[in-house]
A protein has these predicted regions:
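Outer-membrane beta-barrel "beta-signal"
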Residues: 174, 178-183, 189-191, 200-215
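Outer-membrane beta-barrel pore domains and translocons
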Residues: 26-32, 62-66, 85, 97-103, ...
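Residues on the lipid-exposed face of transmembrane beta-strands in outer-membrane beta-barrel proteins
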Residues: 25-27, 47-53, 61, 80-84, ...
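Detector for outer-membrane/organellar transmembrane beta-barrel domains
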Residues: 109-161
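Residues that define the transmembrane beta-barrel architecture of outer-membrane proteins
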Residues: 41-45, 74-78, 108-114, 119-121, ...
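Repeated loop/turn-to-beta-strand initiation elements of outer-membrane beta-barrel proteins
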Residues: 21-23, 55-61, 90-96, 121-126, ...
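Short glycine/proline- and aromatic-enriched beta-strand/turn motifs that initiate or cap beta-hairpins
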Residues: 19-67
């Protein structure tokens, strides 16, 4: 058991009576990360566990059976975050976080980021500062709520990863989350516009089914 997991479990169990805890399981038709497919159009399973303290400190872990685009790719992703979030007023929130993404069978692909997020009314702005030469990422999204649904529009800009120009580009997505009987049904279209060459452009549709529980 690595040091982070020991620390996380210690914090999780020691502060549980003071915290809000939430776990989510999801089934996805593909894993899309910043406009790029991570699983070559194949389904993935994922689990997220999040803990929020009353003082605004927050932490969480996730695992996903993704990233097997080829036999040389890692076959699962495990990550964690530690941060702070603050509700300034009813219409303005911000959060700061340290995020670590790990691939147990391909540690060379591990990366860390610092993230800052502002949400105001139905808009959200996020900036991720890559550490150790990992590229930066920016994203703007808008959510429109109607009935038991969310219409979500997003735009993102991703710097190239090392010398891989195929990841250098912009991405757009439009989708709907529908909340039904405790489950969330998701459907969205994504488009990746590569700066290097139109041959690296990509688009597609993704479906998801998820269940979230607080405890």
């Amino acid at each position: 058991m690595n040091l982070f997991l020991k620390v996380f479990l210690t914090i999780f169990f020691s502060i549980s009576i003071y915290a809000e805890r939430e776990i989510e399981f999801s089934l996805n038709s593909d894993s899309i990360w910043r406009g790029l497919t991570q699983n070559n159009g194949n389904p993935t399973l994922a689990m997220d566990l999040n803990v929020l303290l009353k003082n605004g400190l927050t932490t969480g872990i996730w695992i996903e059976s993704c990233c097997s685009e080829s036999s040389s790719y890692p076959n699962r992703e495990v990550g964690f975050f530690l941060g702070y979030q603050k509700e300034i007023n009813d219409n303005l929130n911000f959060s700061l976080s340290y995020i670590g993404t790990n691939y147990p069978n391909s540690k060379i692909d591990n990366y860390d980021e610092l993230g800052i997020n502002f949400s105001f009314y139905d808009f959200e702005i996020s900036y991720f500062k890559g550490l150790n030469n990992f590229p930066d990422y920016y994203e703007l999204s808008y959510t429109y709520k109607f009935l038991s649904n969310d219409l979500i529009l997003s735009y993102g800009d991703f710097d190239p990863y090392i010398n891989n120009n195929s990841s250098n580009g912009k991405n757009y997505s439009v989708g709907i989350d529908s909340f039904q009987e405790g489950f969330t049904l998701g459907f969205f279209y994504y488009y990746f516009d590569a700066r290097s060459s139109s041959n690296n452009n990509d688009d597609g549709f993704v479906f998801s089914l998820s269940k979230k529980t607080s405890f």
